[in-house]
Amino acid sequence: ERRRGSGTYISSESRRTPRGNSIAIVTTYISDYIFPTIIRGIEETLTNAGYDLTLNVTNNHVEEEARILQSLISRRVDGVIVEGTKTAFPNPNVELYRRLEKMGVPVVFFNSYYRDLPDSVYVVTDDRKAGLQAVDLLIEKGCRRIGGVFKSDDMQGHGRYAGFSEGLIHNGCVLGDDNVVWYTTAERSRLFRPDNSDYMFERLRGCDGIVCYNDQIAYGVIDLLQKHNVRVPEDVLVIGFDDSSISEYSPVKITSFVHPKVEMGRAAANKLIHMLRSSDPEQPLVLDMPLHEKESTRR
């Protein structure tokens, strides 16, 4: 049974007889950036609770997500923890998730979720709030022409942009489309290539503050600006998200919003355990991202 607005749970009528302790983790990536730390939080919690885990990687491709979900349905796993694929777009695999639900298999999303599954249980960050705080900080530091680089195919990018745009309007600043760059997962590796650097620089030229989708992008922006003899933070302030190791080894240490990596993994795992062991409804969770100010915004 599912009740809108009251969380999600598997009723005694729909829950199948448990066949074991098999939990599948489905993630976009595993080996780099913040993903290993999130996965560690999930693994430690589920392993300590006695569950057996399998790890599946989509590389943010919907066709790979479909293949994995079909395999999980045929294997009849007991629970699934998922990081959605291209969550800003309509997802063609929603019916596969509904099949899992009909089978009585609880699903918990982390980092993002699908709006086409409105009653989902998820653990996400408050991206809109952090995007707003990023602009507020830049305004406090004296910035007036603020640009941004955001990811278009994941929900987090839209949330961060929503806060970014709200902050500009609230502070009476111009929201200039020419100074906002959007990119997809497939385009990230091309953003800062030599044959694209002039385009990127022209889009951000004249900005005195730049909000970047994550630390990887902030690192690329700082490198791009320095190659064009623009100093960070003296001429331009730069903010990233996630407070990853990249923010520390960047030539200019990057001010960044802290992603609650281990906490998110543990929370997602605990929600799944609750759904497996109880018929009480489970609620979504939105986590704050505190600011960690470093060199890239210090004047």
Question: What kind of feature is each model-predicted range?
Answer:
Residues E1-R19, R298:
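N-terminal helix-turn-helix DNA-binding module of bacterial transcription factors
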Residues S197-R299:
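Flexible loop/turn connectors
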Residues Y33-N48, A130-Q133, M155-L175, G220, ...:
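Short, solvent-exposed amphipathic alpha-helices that sit
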